[in-house]
């Protein structure tokens, strides 16, 4: 109880009225009570409180609060503060009172003496006032407190604490009944001096008229809620409106039952005599304690003194346990005739673990209570209540009041939880309202009748009065009924009857039955008064399968057929009907009663099978109660006559005669099933069998099939109509109407006796049910046993034989029956015998037997053959398995043998979707997938290990029967053979003894006949084994049939059966070389066995010599001797002749060179390096001799190897060498002739040659390209050429390093690193090092004499732009550079009109150099040396050059300005070199060199070919052409050639100034020298060393013997007019794109560096240092024919001489003195020999000042230098060429051309200067002859080594090769004494 202080009212009352409703209630109260303010409502609600407060004010400072057992006295002391006295038990008060006043009269008097409240409804308080009188005249009684021990009574405080003598006071007592029944209590009044006075109070609690009850005893856990619904009953005849509802606050809140926030007034309006839930009291428990609250309800029926106060007491606890959602199961008010009322029990588990609920039962046992409970577990700590049980109360079973209430006991399995008890109660009203049933029963006549009125009387058997408030008619009855004379309400006293109303019935014509209820609304809930209207008619329908229900239609019947039809009659009237009779109308009909039962239409149809069998024919009448039916059978027996038959059935009742028509058509004929008995083949789950069902129609008309059905309930039998089946059966025919199927799997589902799911090892193993797994077979036997047990169970119960009956109905005949029989079987996938017996088998061999499998199922079957040995414990089931499959008993089954292996040759192994793969899955396990019905055979191989009999089992695992087994038995044995009774082996010696007597012919001097020394012996060969032996071959020590003198005569194959024998004859014929011959006789059988016996022959030792002499000699011996002698003699003479010719070939060039050097006047040091002056020294006849083939490059008309090279451009080598470096393959003189012939077609052979060579120079010099090709060329050349040639080559190669474009995709065919590698510094390995000197000297000799004439011719030709041979243009590769690059395919030569080429050039021009650079970069994968794109860094320089060349007229400039420009350029070059790491590819030394003056003049040529740019453009344009796929090839043409062409041609085919515009200077020109280490330094050193090489060169003049086999490199002075420094620069400066494959950056390739370092010949280093100035040889693209040739000049597009000066200074300051490689200026290491160039050499060259940097730069300008400059000292027997590791320079190689150096299979096959096998070399097109023609095409691509064949076409593309001096001339067999063609290609 709430504790409240105050007077007047009890704490309970005060609490109830002092607090307004909770959040949800206040608006509800306001709405229900109408519009009033909250304050007004609160004041009204506190009406009772005010009364109590007033009374409390009169009580003096005292109050009490009471509970059941404790009295707590509250006393007000003087200070007005309420203090709590010691709380005493009730007994202490009584004792104190008794002790004080024993024997005395009471000093105080109560009025009334005791208080009786009489009956009060529960929850409705009543207050009475009690007065206290003090009868004493003296004493003042001081009242301390008042208390009680019950919660039903509450007392207020006293009006006055002190009662004066004779005075009085009063207090109020409130009775608030909580339960129904008597309540009494004693109030204790404590005084200060007079002890304790007692006062008795009484009351009786009666049921609340509103059926409200207090909510007491609720127990909930903390943080849970208690939410009962407040249901209010309206006991009034008027609607009851709930006006207000309040809670005392705290944790109690009021909510709408629906959970909504508000509602309308209707929500709180309760119709009369109805009960409605109006509010939900929600108590939320926040803390553990006993909580008390009150709910006050006010209605519109309440007066000012009537209150409804409901106490709410809730115990909130923290103890874990089970709690109920309600404190009581209140079933409410029930009548005995009501249906049972059901309430649900919801529980909550507040514990920490789940609790199973074990039982829910009523206590005590109560028949009226039924508990529907299933064991359930309450989850721990759930916040929601769980439904545990349903409790139903059946009022009809509650016979006594003790059954109206009790407890429901809930027990949990948790012992620590106490049992939970929930009280229940119900108010049962015993009684009913009686009425006359006939009064509410009405009959509808056929004709309309008058309205009928019937008074309705009701009898009340209840113990209380029944007040009928309203009468309601159902909707369907309102049309015929009305209620009259009902004045509400009507009261019927208990056990009395009374008139209620009159029911008016107005029948309607529509005959309908009404069976409904009139609703009576009373104070005892609602009553249903049944009212029924009936017609008395019967309902009937014909039972299925007939479609027509209203008449009996037999359809078409055969004349002999009798048919039955059932029909039912139903009495749906509310009265019973008597069927008096039934009879038939018509012939052949009969009727009988089948059944009479209660039910409706559904019941009848469901019982149809029973009705068809039953019969009640003995009855003639029957009475049908309401809701009953009768079933009749009508039988028609057809007559023989055909026709329509009509009849009827009549059924008579009191109300009607029911007539049912009958129809039939009778036809003659019959239908029969065929076959009558269908026997289906055996099947099993997984196999569906079927058979067709046919019907024979003997009627004379079509018969229509109406129905096919199975009369059995077995779902495994079913039928399917086929698409082709017709509905009509043709007369006189047998028709197939359906297929009857039997599917055994339909009934067993997942539990069939065969068939399991199969899981492959890749599938997850989690699968419900039993399944087989691919890789787990140890449980197979258990699975098999369980399945087989199921099968045996079926078989034992005869469940394997099944039958069904199918019925076919047609329109003419019904019930055509066919019996179907099916049989279940145990399947097997084995279709071959289970016992495999192998024949005797040799232990070395195998025998095979076949097992045939067939899948009998309709689903795939997964099969695994597993040897028994693979089971972990086979002994457990082997015996059972043998008996299970009736396998024949054997002595012993080997459980561990693996001698039997199953295999299958399947070309297309299947794989299931699950991952199960056919074939051998692991050791000895064979997997198979059998599709439905598929047959497969597998082979079992028996490979015996021992000579014994082996028996084992092969388990056939499958997911159909799990296991099947095959018994395999085989015997192993060996083949045994004896010869002459001896076993094979070392001891089995078969003796042949030749005695002296047999050799008597040896000593026969007459020798009249051929001596015969053959000994013959016969041996017996026996087969002593069990196997038949087939001897395949007989060998004698490895020779078949005969050998070493032995011979088997009958040596054919033969066969020996067991224990058979055969004779063999062996002959022995000695050769008398040994006295004892021991050999092996080997018999080899078809099974592979070998039997070895020893043949032992002995001869008399002393007769060996004699007999050997007696042997005859062969007749061909003498002839052979003569032939061999002749051949050797001829070969000797041939060698002598060849040696002479070779000596001549070496001596002539050498002599020519000596004469050239002798006639070469000294040069002025101060004058520019002018090649023309040098050339002028030599006669032009030499030039003619050389005929400078188009293949010749421009520096030296031919430097030894160029002549042999196919043309630098075309690279068709005569030799087979395919190496890219072998592109300098030897050219036959035929090539040269072809070239000349083609050249002669143009203006002059020289011009054409020069043009071609320049073109090839352009093309080849581009070819100089690849570091790959270059390096390869170098290595080849290095090996093949002499030192001098190698020097020239090195120059050219030096160019090619510049041209190297890193082409990672094209690795150098030869793994010679392009990067400088110090170890490579050693002399390059020569292809044929034995002749190092020859190659070089050969080249030198040819060069020297022809150079002067050649250069003069070139200069003369320079002025002609006329008609160079069109062949020059034909080289244009149609494909872009990448093609030729990568593929090394010969470029197709297309002759394009100059205009087209010019247009293409213009297109190229349109593209900025940047684009060209991009293009070339794009094309240049690895190291395309010939790409025309300029290095981005050098582009400005190039552009500058091109601009100058385009805009300027060729004005002669002073050499000083040229020198300064050269210096500037070289400086720029140096910077660029530092910035851009590139692979320095020396361009071919064939680049023409043009002095600056001449180059400027050339720029002014009408063809606009500024020579410097022309060169670069030539080389570059060539690249550009290939890169872009345009005809820019023309740009690659040497300017000189351009001179001979028309302007258009110049533009198209030569690099005119416009061409140069299009094509930025060659990348090698513009690219700074790539430094491997410090390339600039090394080049600088090289230049210094070259300057210091004077003495060496002098020696070279006198001693021309080359020390290096490397190809004679044309001296740079003669290199295509390129200055030496330009060569150096070109080699050292590399294309921006040229990256060393090893990725070294900003380093000159060592190829360009000193010979000793880069692995390139010094010349290559010089070439690397080659100046790229426009005037310099920049990158003399593979020697251009003339200085004018654009290729050579274009190469000079180096940044060093952007001014276009042709002289880039032979010693361009490429080298950096500060570089570590720096050497003194004048020291030059030529091929490993250092020498000083400043001496005689430079005095001859005309160097006037010491070689400082400027002078070195000016060296570009020196056009000529004696070839001896490049010769290695004779003292070097082997060249010190280091294998060019860094910058293989194809250019050098190309310059050197196809030098057929003795040691290079291809000219320069392994060029000294090229470690890279790139086909890019102009000559290295081995694979692509044309590609090499367009050097640019092959520049980067190491061409596949294809033997390059020389052809005239080659010459077209060849650049003018200074080395052409060495090319074979008409009068010379070969300029290269050791042409490459004579030696196989190195690689």
Curated annotation (Swiss-Prot):
Segments of skewed composition (Pro residues): 1302-1316, 1602-1611
Keyword annotations of the record: Glycoprotein, Membrane, Phosphoprotein, Signal, Transmembrane, Transmembrane helix
Subcellular location: Membrane
GO molecular function: collagen binding
Residues in compartment: Lumenal: 23-1117
GO cellular component: membrane
Annotated effect of mutating residue 1533 to A: Does not affect TRAPPC8 binding
Comp. bias regions, Basic residues: 1380-1394
Phosphoserine found at: 803, 1322, 1342, 1375, 1863, 1871
Compositional bias segments (type: Low complexity): 1237-1261, 1423-1434, 1619-1630, 1773-1784, 1837-1849
UniProt effect for mutating residue 1577 to A: Does not affect TRAPPC8 binding
Record's signal peptide: 1-22
Stretches with biased composition (Basic and acidic residues): 1330-1343, 1353-1364, 1395-1417, 1436-1458
Coiled coil: none
Domain of life: Eukaryota
PapD-L domain, as annotated region: 109-283
Short name of one Pfam family: Ig_TMEM131L_3
Membrane topology, record value: Single-pass type I membrane protein
Entry-listed glycosylation sites: 300
GO biological process, one term: collagen biosynthetic process
Polar residues bias spans: 1510-1526, 1542-1553, 1678-1690
Reported function: Collagen binding transmembrane protein involved in collagen secretion by recruiting the ER-to-Golgi transport complex TRAPPIII. May play a role in the immune response to viral infection.
Entry comment, domain topic: Possesses a PapD-like (PapD-L) domain similar to PapD domains involved in assembly and secretion of bacterial pilus components. The PapD-L domain can bind collagens and is probably involved in collagen assembly and secretion.
Similarity field: Belongs to the TMEM131 family.
Protein name, per record: Transmembrane protein 131
Species of provenance: Homo sapiens (Human)
């Amino acid at each position: 109880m709430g504790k409240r202080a105050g007077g007047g009212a009890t704490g309970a009352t005060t609490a109830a009225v002092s607090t307004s409703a909770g959040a949800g209630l206040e608006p509800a109260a306001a709405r229900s009570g109408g519009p009033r303010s909250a304050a007004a409502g609160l004041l009204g609600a506190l009406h009772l409180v005010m009364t109590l407060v007033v009374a409390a004010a009169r009580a003096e400072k005292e109050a009490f609060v009471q509970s059941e057992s404790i009295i707590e006295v509250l006393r007000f002391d003087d200070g007005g503060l309420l203090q709590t006295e010691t709380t005493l038990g009730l007994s202490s008060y009584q004792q104190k009172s008794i002790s004080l006043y024993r024997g005395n009269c009471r000093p105080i008097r109560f009025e009334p003496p005791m208080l009786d409240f009489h009956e009060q409804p529960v929850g409705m308080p009543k207050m009475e006032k009690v007065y206290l009188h003090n009868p004493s005249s003296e004493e003042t009684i001081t009242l301390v407190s008042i208390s009680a021990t019950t919660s039903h009574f509450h007392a207020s405080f006293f009006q006055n604490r002190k009662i004066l003598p004779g005075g009085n006071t009063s207090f109020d007592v409130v009775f608030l009944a909580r339960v129904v029944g008597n309540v009494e209590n004693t109030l204790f009044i404590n005084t200060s001096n007079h002890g304790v006075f007692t006062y008795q109070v009484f009351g009786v609690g009666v049921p609340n008229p509103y059926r409200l009850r207090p909510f007491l005893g609720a127990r909930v856990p903390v943080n849970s809620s208690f939410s009962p619904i407040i249901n209010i009953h309206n006991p009034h005849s008027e609607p009851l409106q709930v006006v207000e509802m309040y809670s005392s606050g705290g944790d109690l809140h009021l909510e709408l039952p629906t959970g909504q926030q508000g509602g309308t007034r209707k929500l709180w309006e309760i119709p009369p005599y109805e009960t409605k839930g109006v509010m939900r009291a929600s108590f939320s428990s926040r803390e553990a304690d006993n909580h008390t609250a009150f709910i006050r309800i006010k209605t519109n029926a309440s007066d000012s003194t009537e209150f409804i106060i409901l106490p709410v007491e809730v115990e909130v606890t923290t103890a874990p346990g089970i709690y109920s959602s309600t404190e009581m199961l209140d079933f409410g008010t029930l009548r005995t005739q009501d249906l049972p009322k059901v309430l649900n029990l919801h529980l909550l588990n507040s514990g920490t673990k789940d609790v199973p609920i074990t039982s829910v039962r009523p206590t005590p046992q109560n028949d009226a209570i039924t508990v529907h409970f299933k064991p359930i577990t309450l989850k721990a700590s759930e916040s929601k209540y769980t439904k545990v049980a349903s409790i139903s109360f059946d009022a009809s079973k509650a016979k006594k009041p003790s059954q109206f209430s009790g407890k429901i006991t809930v027990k949990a399995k948790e012992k620590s939880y106490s049992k939970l008890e929930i009280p229940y109660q119900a108010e049962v009203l015993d009684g009913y309202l009686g009425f006359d049933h006939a009064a509410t029963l009405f009959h509808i006549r056929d004709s309309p009748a008058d309205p009928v009125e019937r008074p309705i009387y009701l009898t009340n058997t209840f113990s209380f009065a029944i007040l009928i408030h309203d009468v309601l008619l159902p909707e369907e009855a309102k049309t015929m009924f009305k209620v009259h004379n009902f004045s509400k309400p009507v009261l019927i006293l208990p056990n009395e009857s009374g008139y209620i109303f009159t029911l008016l019935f107005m029948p309607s014509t529509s005959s309908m039955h009404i069976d409904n209820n009139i609703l009576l609304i009373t104070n005892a809930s609602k009553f249903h008064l049944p009212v029924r209207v009936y017609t008395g008619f019967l309902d009937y329908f014909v039972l299925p399968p007939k479609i027509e229900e209203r008449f009996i239609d037999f359809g078409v019947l055969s004349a002999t057929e009798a048919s039955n039809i059932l029909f039912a009659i139903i009495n749906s009237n509310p009265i019973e009907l008597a069927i008096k009779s039934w009879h038939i109308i018509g012939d052949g009909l009969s009727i009988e009663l089948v059944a009479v039962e209660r039910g409706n239409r559904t019941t009848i149809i469901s019982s149809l099978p029973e009705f068809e069998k039953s019969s009640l024919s003995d009855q003639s009448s029957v009475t049908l109660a309401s809701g009953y039916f009768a079933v009749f059978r009508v039988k028609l027996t057809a007559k023989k006559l055909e026709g329509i038959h009509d009849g009827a059935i009549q059924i008579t009742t009191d109300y009607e005669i029911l007539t049912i028509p009958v129809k039939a058509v009778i036809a003659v004929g019959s239908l029969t099933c065929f076959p009558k008995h269908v026997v289906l083949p055996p099947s099993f789950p997984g196999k569906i069998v079927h058979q067709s069902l046919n019907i024979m129609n003997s009627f004379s008309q079509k018969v229509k099939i109406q129905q096919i059905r199975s009369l059995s309930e077995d779902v495994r039998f079913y039928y399917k109509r086929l698409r082709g089946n017709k509905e009509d059966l043709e007369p006189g025919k047998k028709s197939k109407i359906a297929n009857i199927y039997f599917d055994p799997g339909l009934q067993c589902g997942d539990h069939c006796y065969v068939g399991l799911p199969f899981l492959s090892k890749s599938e997850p193993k989690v699968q419900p049910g039993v399944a087989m797994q691919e890789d787990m077979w140890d449980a197979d036997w258990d699975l098999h046993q369980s399945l087989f047990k199921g099968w045996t169970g079926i078989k034992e119960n005869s469940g394997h034989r099944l039958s069904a009956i199918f019925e076919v109905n047609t329109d003419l005949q019904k019930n055509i029956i066919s019996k179907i029989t099916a049989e279940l079987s145990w399947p097997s996938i084995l279709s071959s015998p289970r016992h495999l017996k192998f024949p005797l088998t040799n232990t070395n061999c195998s025998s095979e037997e076949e097992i045939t499998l067939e899948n009998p199922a309709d689903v795939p079957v997964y099969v695994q053959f597993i040897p028994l040995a693979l089971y972990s414990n086979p002994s457990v089931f082997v015996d059972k398995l043998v008996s299970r499959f009736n396998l024949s008993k054997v002595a012993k089954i080997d459980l561990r043998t693996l001698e039997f292996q199953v295999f299958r040759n399947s070309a297309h192994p299947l794989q299931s979707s699950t991952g199960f793969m056919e074939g051998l899955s692991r050791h000895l396990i064979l997997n198979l997938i059998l599709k439905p019905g598929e047959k497969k055979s597998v082979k079992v191989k028996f490979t015996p290990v021992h000579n014994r009999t082996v028996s084992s089992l092969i388990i056939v695992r499958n997911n159909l029967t799990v296991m099947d087994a095959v018994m395999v038995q085989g015997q192993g044995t060996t083949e045994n053979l004896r010869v002459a009774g001896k076993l094979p082996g070392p001891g089995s010696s078969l003796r042949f003894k030749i005695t002296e007597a047999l050799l008597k012919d040896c000593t026969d001097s007459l020798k009249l006949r051929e001596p015969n020394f053959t000994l013959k012996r016969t041996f017996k060969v026996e087969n002593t084994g069990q196997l038949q032996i087939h001897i395949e071959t007989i060998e004698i020590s490895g020779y078949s049939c005969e050998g070493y003198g032995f011979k088997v005569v009958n040596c054919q194959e033969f066969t020996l059966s067991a224990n058979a024998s055969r004779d063999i004859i062996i002959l022995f014929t000695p050769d008398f070389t040994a006295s004892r011959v021991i050999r092996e006789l080997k018999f080899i059988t078809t099974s592979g066995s070998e039997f070895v016996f020893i043949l032992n022959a002995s001869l008399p030792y002393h007769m060996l010599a004699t007999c050997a002499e007696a042997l005859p000699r062969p007749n061909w011996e003498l002839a052979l001797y003569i032939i061999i002698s002749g051949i050797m003699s001829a070969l000797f003479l041939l060698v002598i002749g060849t040696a002479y010719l070779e000596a001549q070939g070496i001596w002539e060039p050498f002599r020519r060179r000596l004469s050239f050097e002798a006639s070469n006047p000294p040069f002025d040091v101060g004058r520019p390096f002018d090649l023309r002056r040098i050339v002028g020294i030599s006669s032009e006849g030499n030039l003619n001799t050389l005929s400078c083939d188009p293949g010749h490059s421009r520096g030296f008309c031919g430097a030894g190897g160029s002549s042999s090279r196919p043309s630098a451009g075309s690279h068709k080598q005569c030799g087979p060498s395919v190496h890219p470096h072998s592109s300098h393959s030897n050219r036959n003189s035929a090539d040269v002739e072809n070239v000349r012939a083609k050249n002669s077609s143009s203006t002059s052979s020289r011009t054409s040659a020069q043009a071609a060579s320049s073109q090839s120079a352009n093309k080849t010099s581009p070819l100089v390209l690849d570091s790959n090709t270059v390096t390869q060329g170098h290595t080849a050349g290095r090996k093949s050429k002499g030192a001098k040639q190698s020097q020239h080559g090195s120059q050219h190669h030096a160019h090619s390093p510049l041209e190297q474009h890193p082409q990672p995709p094209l690795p150098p065919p030869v793994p010679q690193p392009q990067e400088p590698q110090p170890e490579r510094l050693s002399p390059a390995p020569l292809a044929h090092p034995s002749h190092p000197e020859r190659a070089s000297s050969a080249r030198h000799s040819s060069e020297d004499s022809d150079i002067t004439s050649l250069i003069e011719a070139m200069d003369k030709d320079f002025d002609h732009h006329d008609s160079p041979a069109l062949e020059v243009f034909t080289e244009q590769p149609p494909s872009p550079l990448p093609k030729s690059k990568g593929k090394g395919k010969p470029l197709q030569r297309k002759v394009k009109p100059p205009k087209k080429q010019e247009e293409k050039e213009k297109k190229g021009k349109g593209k900025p150099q940047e684009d060209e650079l991009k293009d070339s970069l794009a094309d240049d994968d690895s190291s395309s040396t010939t790409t025309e794109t300029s290095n981005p860094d050098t582009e400005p320089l190039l552009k500058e050059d091109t601009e100058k060349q385009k805009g300027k007229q060729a004005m002669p400039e002073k050499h000083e300005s040229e020198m300064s420009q050269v210096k500037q350029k070289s400086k720029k070059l140096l910077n660029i070199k530092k910035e851009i790491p590139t692979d320095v590819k020396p361009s071919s030394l064939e680049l023409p060199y043009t002095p600056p003056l001449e180059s400027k003049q050339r720029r002014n040529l009408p063809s606009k070919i500024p020579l410097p740019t022309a060169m670069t453009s030539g080389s570059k344009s060539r690249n550009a052409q290939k890169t872009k796929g345009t005809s820019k090839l023309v740009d690659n043409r040497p300017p000189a050639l351009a001179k001979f062409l028309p302007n258009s041609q110049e533009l198209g085919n030569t690099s005119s100034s416009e061409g140069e515009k299009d094509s930025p200077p060659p990348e090698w020109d513009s690219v700074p020298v790539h430094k491997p280490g410090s390339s600039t330094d090394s080049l600088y050193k090289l230049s210094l060393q070259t300057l210091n090489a004077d003495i060496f060169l002098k020696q070279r003049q006198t001693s021309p013997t080359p020390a290096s086999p490397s190809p004679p490199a044309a001296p740079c002075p003669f290199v295509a007019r390129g200055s030496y420094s330009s060569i150096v620069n070109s080699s050292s400066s590399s294309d921006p794109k040229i990256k060393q494959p090893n990725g070294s950056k900003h380093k000159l390739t060592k190829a360009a560096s000193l010979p000793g370092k880069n692995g390139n010949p010094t010349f290559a280093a010089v070439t690397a240092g080659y100046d790229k100035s426009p005037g310099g040889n920049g990158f003399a693209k593979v020697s251009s024919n003339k200085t004018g040739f654009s290729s050579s000049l274009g190469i000079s597009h180096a940044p060093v001489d952007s001014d276009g000066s042709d002289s880039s200074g032979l010693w361009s300051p490429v080298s950096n003195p500060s570089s570590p490689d720096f050497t003194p200026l004048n020291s030059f290491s030529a091929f490993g020999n250092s020498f000083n160039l400043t001496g005689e050499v430079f005095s001859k060259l005309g160097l006037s000042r010491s070689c400082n940097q400027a002078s070195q730069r000016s060296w570009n300008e020196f056009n000529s230098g004696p070839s001896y400059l490049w010769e290695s000292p004779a003292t070097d027997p082997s060249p010190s060429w280091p294998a060019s590791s860094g910058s293989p320079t194809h250019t050098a190689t190309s310059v050197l051309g196809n030098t057929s150096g003795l040691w290079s299979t291809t000219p320069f096959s392994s060029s000294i200067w090229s470690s890279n096998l790139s086909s890019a070399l102009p000559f290295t097109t081995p694979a692509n002859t044309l590609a090499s023609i367009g050097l640019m095409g092959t520049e980067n691509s190491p061409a596949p080594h294809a033997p390059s064949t020389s052809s005239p076409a080659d010459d077209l593309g060849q650049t003018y090769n200074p080395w052409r001096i060495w090319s074979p001339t008409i009068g010379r067999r070969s300029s290269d004494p050791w042409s490459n063609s004579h030696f196989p290609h190195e690689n």
